[in-house]
């Protein structure tokens, strides 16, 4: 079961310091691994179509899935036919497989199933991203660009554009796993092509990114959809009653705060990221609605009661981001 980030990742506490020797080893291995690909000692797989990776240098939720949805829409607007590859975290599908319409979350993972539903786009999952991409291109030969979800550190897949999604907690205590939240050193952000900032940035991150192309993003939603498809409501319909907000995502407090700002009386129920929900997890007081994130809704639709709702959000990204991505995609040089 995935767990949310420990509190000591944001501080240099004793608990974090005790893990520093392991972080030093992690840093060495990560740096050597990347250099092997940059120097050509290990060969990255170059696909016959361009690849755009969306990721982060830290673990945890920063808003990558809404960015992938936004990116797919912008690519289509520009005349591309995109496909998506993903790790399929939490899924049990063997090898590289295509996610079918209405795929089983237990088999393919929550994020790939959600992306397939949101984008109506071909999605392939697999720990081996090049193999997943090849499977997708074989099944959908008309696909002319691949979007790699959470693929920044997957160097076996060559890429043409790198997008990093960051927020105010990205750097944390600036230490690598397991003492901190970082998968790679902070300087890695200076190498990516586009940085999308979800909300305000910390002073340390703002300083690090000074002079880099940073585009602000916020997530916005306006209606609530019943999980059985029987209707939609706006926030006004939930005012005056307690609502149980359920979130098994990297930053559940962000979801709860968004509902509170809309005037709802929220009872928060945070769960670990990628939590495998059961009906018992949603067993609250009768007559009090339950509101879920889209990522959790795909896991609960088969057993949710009639008073269970999804709150879908869309990424709104500052002007110029799409144009910069498309310029790099069509005229830029491949990124190592």
UniProtKB/Swiss-Prot annotation:
Entry keywords, A to Z: ATP-binding, Kinase, Lipid A biosynthesis, Lipid biosynthesis, Lipid metabolism, Nucleotide-binding, Transferase
Annotated EC: 2.7.1.130
InterPro entries: LpxK, P-loop_NTPase
Gene Ontology MF annotations: ATP binding; tetraacyldisaccharide 4'-kinase activity
Catalyzed chemical reaction(s): a lipid A disaccharide + ATP = a lipid IVA + ADP + H(+)
The keyword rRNA-binding appears for this protein: no
Any Pfam family matching the protein: LpxK
Family: Belongs to the LpxK family.
Function: Transfers the gamma-phosphate of ATP to the 4'-position of a tetraacyldisaccharide 1-phosphate intermediate (termed DS-1-P) to form tetraacyldisaccharide 1,4'-bis-phosphate (lipid IVA).
Protein known as: Tetraacyldisaccharide 4'-kinase
Organism expressing this protein natively: Aromatoleum aromaticum (strain DSM 19018 / LMG 30748 / EbN1) (Azoarcus sp. (strain EbN1))
Upper taxonomic lineage: Bacteria, Pseudomonadati, Pseudomonadota, Betaproteobacteria, Rhodocyclales
